[in-house]
C-alpha cells in the first residue's frame, strides 16, 4: 500500500458536512466506502478540515493508503466512475507517508455567494437566497475591512470547537456586489467552526441596518458575540494552500523542456 493525495470537488447540498457521521450521510462516509471497495479492505481518509452541512468545495485535499498496482491516474478514473454525481476527484498524486493535509494547510479561501432573486435550478443550490432586502453596500465594505489582520475571532465561532487558540489571521477580505448578487471572499491562515458564516451574517446585518459598522470592533474585542449565521448553501471552500504541496510537486516532476 502506498499513500495518495487527492483533491475532491463536491456539492454539499445533500450531505451532513464532510466529517464522518454515524448515519452515513457525510461526504467522508461516501468517500471511504468507495475507497474501501477498491482496496478490498477498510480505508480511512484524512482531510484538511471539516465543512458544515450544505457547504460546497472546489478542491478539498485528502489522503488515503491505496493499492500500489493502481497508478494515480487510474485511482482518479475509478473513483470518478464510482462516486455519486455530486462528487468528483479532480487530482490524485502519490505522496510521502509523512504528508498530512491538515497539518500542511497554511491558508484557505472561502467564498460566500448570495442572491436577492431566484437563479433557477442550475444555480439555486450554490447561492443563499436573501430576497427583497435593500443593503447599504458602503457600510458592508467598511465593516469588512475591519476583519483583516490577526484577531481573536472567538465571537465569530460556534460552540462545539475544541481548538487551543481562537486567534486567526485574515490576509484578505473582499466584497463584491453585482446586480442582485453578493460575493464575500475570505483568505486566512485558518477558520474557526462556523466563523465564515457568522462573519457574513454580521456583514449582512450591518448592510441591512440591524447592526452598526462598529459592531465588528465589539465582537473582535470580546464585548459582543455574532448571533446571525448566514445560510450554509452559499458557502464554498475555494482553495487550500499546502506546504509542502504534493500536487504542485507532481506538476513540477512532470514538466518537460521543449526548448
UniProtKB/Swiss-Prot annotation:
InterPro entries: PsdUridine_synth_cat_dom_sf, PsdUridine_synth_TruA, PsdUridine_synth_TruA_a/b_dom, PsdUridine_synth_TruA_C, TruA/RsuA/RluB/E/F_N
EC number: 5.4.99.12
GO biological process: tRNA pseudouridine synthesis
Record-annotated disulphide pairs: none
UniProt keyword Isomerase present: yes
GO molecular function: RNA binding; tRNA pseudouridine(38-40) synthase activity
Catalytic activity: uridine(38/39/40) in tRNA = pseudouridine(38/39/40) in tRNA
Name of a matching Pfam family: PseudoU_synth_1
Transmembrane helix among keywords: no
Active-site residues, Swiss-Prot/TrEMBL: 52 (nucleophile)
Superkingdom: Bacteria
Sites where the protein binds substrate: 110
Keywords, ordered alphabetically: Isomerase, tRNA processing
PANTHER family associated with the record: PSEUDOURIDYLATE SYNTHASE (PTHR11142), TRNA PSEUDOURIDINE SYNTHASE-LIKE 1 (PTHR11142:SF0)
Function of the molecule: Formation of pseudouridine at positions 38, 39 and 40 in the anticodon stem and loop of transfer RNAs.
Assembly behavior: Homodimer.
HAMAP family: TruA
Family: Belongs to the tRNA pseudouridine synthase TruA family.
Name this polypeptide is given: tRNA pseudouridine synthase A
Chain's gene name: truA
